[in-house]
């Protein structure tokens, strides 16, 4: 797995890749393993910070990064490099990242580091996305299972990450905290288990 510096986590141009399909005959798990491994997949256009299979409205997810402001490189990374690996996807550019409140304010964006069970919740809002993001974080008190959130430029306005030690720990709050937040008009959730899950061959 890629070793990512703390600086890379919150600098540069970030995007979230929602993998809808892979080339016929390929297995999504094999594709994800390949793009997540810097020894098997590297590009001068960008890098994969995290990738996993997912269960929900898409079959895989990747968090990718290009150099600051280099949209051309990001497009090459998605439409040439990832496409060549068989990745058919929807995507969103990451905007403002949620920042914790208080004296030691820190950025807290989705899919940086988290426990094994994860819910990635795409949120559409009819209000100010930054205000809705802050309200969702407030409902969790900046604590687990809330891991982070970002404004996104794509089909949804926000991406929120919940993570915990069980599936219930991340699925129940989608219904009780996120969907009930003022300004939320729809959510779209996929789940990721980042522990070992494949049957040994």
Residue ranges and their predicted role:
Residues 1-201:
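A compositional/biophysical signature of low hydrophobicity enriched in polar/charged and small residues
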């Amino acid at each position: 797995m890629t070793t990512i510096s703390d600086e890379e986590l919150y600098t540069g141009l970030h995007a979230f890749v929602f993998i809808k399909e892979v080339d016929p005959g390929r297995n999504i798990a094999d594709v994800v393993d390949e793009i997540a491994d810097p020894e098997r997949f590297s590009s001068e256009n960008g890098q994969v910070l995290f990738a996993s299979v997912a269960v929900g409205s898409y079959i895989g997810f990747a968090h990718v990064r290009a150099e600051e402001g280099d949209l051309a490189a990001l497009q090459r990374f998605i439409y040439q490099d990832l496409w060549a690996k068989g990745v058919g996807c929807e995507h969103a550019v990451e905007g403002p990242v949620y920042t914790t409140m208080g004296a030691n304010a820190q950025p807290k964006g989705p899919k940086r580091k988290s426990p094994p069970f994860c819910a990635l919740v795409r949120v559409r809002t009819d209000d100010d996305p930054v205000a809705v993001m802050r309200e969702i974080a407030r409902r969790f008190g900046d604590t687990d299972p809330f891991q982070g959130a970002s404004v996104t430029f794509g089909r949804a306005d926000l991406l929120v990450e919940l993570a915990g030690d069980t599936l219930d720990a991340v699925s129940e709050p989608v219904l009780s905290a996120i969907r009930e937040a003022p300004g939320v008009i729809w959510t779209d959730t996929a789940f990721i288990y980042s522990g070992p899950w494949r049957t040994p061959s």
